[in-house]
Amino acid sequence: MSALQEIPSPISNMQTSNFAHVIFQNVAKSYLPNAPLECHYTLTQYIHPHPKDWVGIFKVGWSTPRDYFTFLWSLMPEKYVAESTCNCVLTFQGYYLPNDDGEFYQFCYVTHKGEIRGASTPFQFRASSPVDELLTMEDEGHSDMLVVTTKTGLLELKIEKTMKEKEELVKITTVLEKEVLQLREHVEGLESEFLREQKRSEQLSSEREELFNASEILRNESDEAKRKCKEMSAKIIQLEEDIMLVTQKAIAKETELDSLKDKLKKVVLEKDQLECQLKYEKDEKDLYKVHLKNTEIENTKLLTEVQTLKNLDTNKENLISHYKEELGKLQICLADKEKMNKELLQNSSNKEDIAFLKQQLRKLEDQHQASRQEVSLMSRELSEAVNKRDKTMADLHSARLDTDSVRMQLADALAQLSMRDEQQQKSNPFAKKDQGADNNRVEQELRKEVEDLKLRLQMAADHYKDKFKECQKLQKQVVKLTEQLKATENQQKERELFCATEAAAVTVMKQCTPPVSPFTSDSLPEFDIREQVREMSLEMAEKTEKYRKCKQMLAEEKARCSAYADDVAKMELKWKEQLKVNDSIKRQLIALDDQYKVQSAEKDREICDLSYSIETLRNEKAKMERFINDLEKKLEKQAGWAASNTQGLQFFNPYCDEHRLAPAIPAQQPLLQFGNPYASQETRDGADGAFNPDEVQGPPVRATSWGLEDKVVCSQPARNLSRPDGLEDPDENNAGLITKDEDDDDDDDNVNFEQTPDPTRIAMHDQSGFCFEAGYTMNKKCPLCPVSFPPNYDQGQFEAHVESHWKVCPMCNEQFPPDCDQQIFERHVQTHFDGSVLNFD
């Protein structure tokens, strides 16, 4: 027992709600032990059946699903729908059932997982006995005696009662049919009497006054409606004028769009031109790079040459100092010679030669100083050229960076322009055909401009190549001249050394030898000096010419470099200006695009609002016109009716309290025929689940409609707040139908109400809606088509037929009259997909 207590019961762990997932139906209190047993149960939506589920018979007090007595597999129901209820039946064979042991059993539904999802009320298996077939019931004579009968006898008595009730009901129906025929005959008699009776002049006069008052009210309403129509027409005209203005503005905006598109095309063409210019500038930059490399090489050569020239200048200065010393010595010698000449009284010709030699020496000194100054100037010019070269290199590097940045900006601008072009093509797919001719023309013009630019660039490249070749030739000439200068300087040095040695030798000879006659010893050195002076003058002249030529070449090279630098600066300025212009044009285009989009969106909204307002005004105008026509028709009908002193057919309402008959059978609420299977056991009579005579009832006797219904109200589905267009007034509808039946079907069994026009009914015209009067029993006719329906036709189907004539919007369920224009209806449906907001006020 302790082990059994420790094992937890599965029933305690399961939720109590799981037992209600399968409901067992019609479970009796007892069953025969050896007879087949049918088990009826319902699968709710909370359980999913499985082929391995089973239904077992358990003894009351079971603890686990294994404590079953017998079981059957629960078959899968046919045409099972998930999450829906399903009724099933299983039949247990008699030889599997327990015997009459006095124990209580119950049905349990067990899933394939071993979970119990349903349990029935307890029952027993008991053998049949004659006492079970007996029932006790009270005597019908209202005595205190109890009568014992069998079930079969009780059922036979009930069947006899139901048959008698059926016969009585048949008799009642025949009587009612006869009464209906009598009432119809009576109604026909009343109609004939009503046609004959025309003596109610007082009633007619009062009705005339009421009609006149109603006609005046209707006239006032018609005047107001006409005034409203005039106002609406004026509003429509104003709206049409506004639409014309809006269309004109839209056309102007379209022209602006076309101009903007042309500007865009021009900008794209300029962009292509700039790309071509960039390509050509790249080529020029490459050429400039090559030229810079060559100029750098030449500059290095020139620097080396300048250094050599500086060395030569130092050597020349040394030589000049040496020559000065020698000149001083020569002057001393000349002074000695002059003294000697004075002493010897030489001829005046010798004096003139000495003066000439002095002048030549002075000239040589001046030329030497001039050459030194020219060398210093050349060095300065070379330094300036080097500085300019450095500046040009820096400018070229900055220009390269600028071109790279411009290239990136152009790429971004191209991407943006391509995106805008795609967007414009998507937004305006129909504008491509119109722009084809303009595009071709613009492309031809752009091609011509590109060809012209190519020719110009080719000419500039050829010119640059020629200039580059000239620069190379000049550089070669400069190299040759520097080499010649070096050779001449070397020769001059050698000659100066030779002259210095000869002068030193002459001075030594003069110092050593005594003075002799002037024509023998002094004439030779003077002649040599003259020859040396002539040679030096010639060399100096050649050097000055070479310096002059070099100077001219350097000046030309500087001019060319400055011209190239100016060209590069101009190109950079032009490029920057073009970039600024492109940026400004892009910004303007972006601003114009945004403005145009905003304006176009606003105009579209205005157009949609105006079109919708025009449609509403037209609908209102149509409503007012129809309302005025209806009022005029009513006035004409009432005036004619009053003039002829005739009145519509009157008849009594057979459904009122005065003419209503008492019901033949009192109305009773139907009771449960088979009882509640889950009711308490106290209500059951006996232990075997037999039927209680109080619970066993015949079919509920339905009371006649004469006693149950006071008024018949047609249930009409809810409609829009606004009254549908083109729908006639139900009162007028009924009146029209009655008059038609009077004119066309005089022999039919139709009934007309007493028609008394009331101003309150006319005032409630707009609030009446679409419904039918309760007492209207004649044939139902569709107000929109000539189809008629019998009086007992289903009201829902009749309303569905009437609504089928109307056009219903699939998005907002707004109804349109049958004569509504299809384009207006489609435009209304399209407004739901355009993103525009509709107001249904």
Curated annotation (Swiss-Prot):
A zinc finger (UBZ1-type) spans 779-805, 806-832. Residues 173-560, 612-640 form a coiled coil. One of its GO terms (molecular function) is zinc ion binding. It holds the Pfam family CALCOCO1. Signal peptide: none annotated. InterPro entries: CALCOCO1-like, CALCOCO1/2_Zn_UBZ1, SKICH, UBA_autophagy_assoc_protein. Residues 431-441 have a biased composition (Basic and acidic residues). Keywords: Apoptosis, Coiled coil, Metal-binding, Repeat, Zinc, Zinc-finger. It comes from the Eukaryota. This is Tax1-binding protein 1 homolog.
